[in-house]
A protein has these predicted regions:
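Short internal beta-strands
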Residues: 89-92
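Catalytic-core regions built around general acid/base machinery
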Residues: 134, 157-171
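Portal/gating segments that form or line small-molecule/metal binding sites
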Residues: 96-133, 137
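Catalytic nucleophile loop
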Residues: 144-145, 168-188
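N-terminal secretory signal peptides
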Residues: 1-10, 17-23
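C-terminal and late-domain segments of enzyme folds
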Residues: 39-84, 99-111, 188-190, 194-325
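Boundary at the C-terminal end of the N-terminal hydrophobic targeting segment
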Residues: 31-33
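Glycine/threonine-rich flexible loop motifs
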Residues: 148-157
């Protein structure tokens, strides 16, 4: 087992900018720039961290898209009560054409011994007592892929979502893939640009504050912003841009065929075939401007394969040996 306590934390205060780059990253004439973020955490900040990373009774398992590995499906069923006991709702509302995918998920879960069924919640039923009572019977909830904005606009603030959250707080497992992963945070990336730049090329590569549109998500994954298909679609720019706008939140980039399990004990565990990348700017030095190019220093990045653990409270990483057949 290998442990990492992170890197050196920069001092609080103004960040010196040298030729347009942070001190230590370039050379040239210096000017002063205001920064956000900063050094050590005071008592109020520590209390805020405690609220952001408070522990629910349930587990959250989110996949970065692509094929969901069998080991991840097995873990989901186990967390929902195990074979014969797990009763799982498959919720396909992120897509208007997801019935076939949802039925495939049901077949996969049933093949692992769970009782699973598709639960399609219509806009007219989101505050229905009958729907809420139906949802209360499940021990697991799985959100399929599509467009996270469809899920957010349909369910946020509704009785249906409150019923799912109540089950989560009582010990149920909530999961999803692709859009069903992004929607789990309190603030979610919509995939849209808030401030388009001058060229398509610049939009693809820039890291800048104020660029990405965020919208309310479900709020099950507190203290984080999630992006999916991360390595396969080269989404570093949009997740880092969002983290610079909200440095109190940890950026979580999940690759395809890979999952992050947010455990009831507060630990984050990586499952699957590729990586979860974590961007932690809670103690970073960030230049407070909205120019076309971001300026920041001391952002921690962790690259975690299967078996990797992250403790968001203590900012610690552990790597565990994984047996590969």
């Amino acid at each position: 087992m290998v442990k990492s306590d992170g890197f050196v934390i920069g001092r609080r205060g103004a960040l010196r900018v040298l030729g347009g780059m942070a001190a230590g990253l370039g050379v040239g004439a210096s000017v002063q720039a205001q920064t956000t973020g900063g050094g050590g955490l005071g008592s109020s900040a520590l209390q805020a961290v405690g609220r952001l990373f408070s522990r629910p009774q349930g587990n959250l398992l989110i996949v970065g898209g692509g094929d969901t590995p069998l080991s991840v499906q097995q873990r989901f069923v186990a967390l929902a009560g195990g074979p014969e006991n797990a009763r799982i709702a498959v919720l396909p509302m992120a897509s208007s054409q997801s019935d076939e995918e949802a039925q495939e998920v049901v077949r996969d879960l049933e093949g692992l011994g769970a009782r699973a069924q598709v639960v399609e919640i219509r806009p007219t039923d989101v505050n229905s007592t009958a729907v809420a009572q139906t949802l209360e019977k499940f021990s697991g909830f799985w959100f399929s892929g599509g467009d996270q904005s469809r899920l957010s606009s349909l369910l946020v603030g509704t009785r249906a979502l409150q019923a799912i959250e109540a089950r989560y707080q009582a010990g149920a497992v909530v999961g999803g893939t692709s859009a069903g992963a992004s929607v789990m945070s309190r603030l979610m990336l919509t995939g849209k640009w808030r401030t388009p730049r001058n060229s398509d090329e610049e939009e693809q590569v820039n890291i800048a504050r104020g660029m990405k549109e965020l919208a309310p998500g479900f709020g099950f994954f507190k203290g984080a912003i999630v992006d999916q298909h991360f390595m396969h679609r080269a989404r570093y720019n949009r997740l880092i841009s969002a983290v610079l706008d909200h440095p109190q939140l940890i950026g979580v980039g999940i690759d395809e065929e890979t999952a992050l399990l947010v455990r009831a004990d507060g630990q984050w565990e990586v499952l699957g075939n590729y990586y979860v990348k974590i961007f932690d700017a809670r103690r970073a030095q960030i230049v407070d401007d909205r120019g076309p190019m971001a300026k920041a220093a001391d952002i921690r990045m962790h690259v975690l394969p299967e078996g990797g653990l992250f403790d968001p409270r203590r900012r610690r990483v552990e790597f565990q040996e994984v047996n590969i057949p």
